[in-house]
Structure formats: C-alpha cells, structure tokens
Amino acid sequence: MRFRLAVLAATGALACAGEPARTDAPARPAVEYLPMTGGDRLPFSAAARVGSMLYLSGQIGNDSALRLVPGGIGPETRQTMENIRAILARSGATLDDVIRCTVMMADMKEWGAMNQVYAGFFPRHRPARSAFGATGLALGARVEIECIALVPPA
C-alpha cells in the first residue's frame, strides 16, 4: 500500500512539474535607433525602427543649430514638418509612408493656422491623428509633432 502511495505521489509531482521551456519561441525583433543629427547631447534618438515600423520622436520647429525658428505657429509647423521629412528620408521613407501623427500645441486657439500648414504636407493621404494642448514644450515651441511610418524593407 505504501509503495502505491509513493508511486502515486511521484506521478502527481511529475505531472505538476509542467512543460520544459520552449526553445522555438519567436525571436524578439531587432530595434534600430536612428541618432539625432547634430544633437549628440540629447538623450533620445530621432527615431526607432522595428521591422517595417518607424517611430519618430516628437519634432519641433528648430533649425540645424537647435534654435526655434521665429514667426510663430505657421513657420514652426512648417519647420517641424521639414524636420520630420528629413528623418523619414534618412530611413528611406517619405511623408507618404506616415500612417499616424500626434500633435501637441501650446495654444489650441492656433489650431487653424497649424492645420493649414500641416495639411499641405499630406496632399495624397491624411494619416490618423490626435492633437491636444500641452504646456512646457521644448525651447518654448508652439507645436510638437511625432509620427509613425510604415517604411520600405531595409
């Protein structure tokens, strides 16, 4: 009787041990980071690519010397979009590859002026988009835009 109980207990213990770890689990996709140009002192990348997805960091209307362009929301939005276009080009993509944007604005009353410039950069399609008011944008910017693009294979 004791032998049967011991065998039963051992069988139960083995059954509870579970499956061995799987070795055929899919590999984690590689992440490629696109460095900032001229901004090595900044603690973030211009974009990160995972497979065919390109995630751009938020961009503001700064020039190559990292100074905000003068003139308010219109010129800032134009420069922001040009900065986005340049990052996309470094990854072999264009604005036509953008599928989503998030717009942060210091003053939502400037919505119309921002939209007028923004829309000119997407004449063939309009990416999905969210927008909200935000305080404390970098360098006192009026607008910051981040995008996600579906990019051609590397």
Predicted features and spans:
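N-terminal presequence-like segments and the immediate start of the first folded domain
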Residues: 5-9, 16-82, 86-96, 105-154
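Surface-exposed aromatic
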Residues: 99-101
